[in-house]
């Protein structure tokens, strides 16, 4: 189970294939996914809340392509379809929101040795940027990024003063397939992955 960012709700997996949310005040439960996008009964799937509590990213089986999972995005209100963010045809998993909710970090075997015979796959760490502004900022050269920081220093000071307010996650689905970035220089047998808050450093076990 995972608490929502504001601590008012609790997400959990029911019967190993459905994502559900319990409102801790009203005790009402709402369904986020209906179970049709996860066929395994071996232990559930990975998912994560967005920082604003309005979205989930999750592993799911898209296009009835079991056992290969994709990375999805779905409304936390329980009234939306899962958006397939990867459509790779190969296994992707372990999604988490990073960079203040502007991107999703995940691992995939789309570039490494693939499990065509159900063994021997290698992984890479990836980012999918949810909006163009975050992608453009990430793509800046070191010199351009320093200029960007200098030009926006006053704006950052104002934002730091109001840091207690949670910003809404901006989701722009148009051309999102062009905002997927490979972070690791080579594929490996990966464990967990983390990225620093400023997006400069990737940590992973391999």
Where are each of the predicted segments found?
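A short helix->beta-strand "capping" segment at the edge of beta-propeller domains
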Residues: 168-187
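Solvent-exposed, polar/charged alpha-helical surfaces in well-ordered, non-transmembrane soluble domains
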Residues: 30, 99-102, 181
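Blade-terminus and WD-like Trp-Asp/Gly-His loop motifs, strongest in beta-propeller folds
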Residues: 1-9, 47-56, 95-104, 193-201
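Conserved blade-ending motifs and adjacent loop-strand segments that build the rim/top face
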Residues: 45, 82-96, 181-191
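Beta-strand-rich domains and repeat architectures in extracellular enzymes and scaffolds
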Residues: 184-206
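A flexible loop/linker signature enriched in serine peptidases of the S9 family
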Residues: 8-24, 34-42, 54, 59-72, ...
């Amino acid at each position: 189970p995972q608490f929502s960012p504001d601590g008012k709700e609790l997400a959990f997996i029911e019967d190993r294939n459905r994502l559900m949310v319990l409102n801790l005040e009203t005790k009402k439960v709402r369904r986020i996914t209906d179970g049709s996008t996860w066929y395994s009964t071996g232990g559930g799937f990975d998912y994560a809340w967005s920082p604003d509590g309005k979205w989930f990213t999750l592993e799911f089986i898209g296009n009835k392509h079991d056992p290969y999972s994709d990375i999805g995005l779905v409304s936390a209100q329980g009234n939306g379809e899962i958006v397939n963010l990867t459509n790779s045809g190969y296994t992707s998993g372990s999604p988490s929101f990073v960079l203040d909710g502007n991107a999703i970090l995940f691992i995939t075997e789309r570039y490494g040795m693939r499990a065509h015979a159900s063994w021997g796959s290698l992984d890479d760490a990836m980012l999918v940027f949810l909006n163009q502004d975050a992608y453009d900022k990430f793509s800046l050269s070191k010199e351009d990024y320093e200029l960007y920081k200098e030009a926006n220093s006053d704006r950052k000071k104002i934002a730091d003063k109001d840091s207690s307010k949670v910003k809404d996650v901006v989701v722009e689905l148009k051309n999102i397939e062009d905002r997927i970035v490979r972070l690791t220089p080579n594929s490996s047998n990966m464990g967990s992955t983390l990225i620093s808050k400023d997006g400069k450093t990737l940590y992973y076990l391999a």
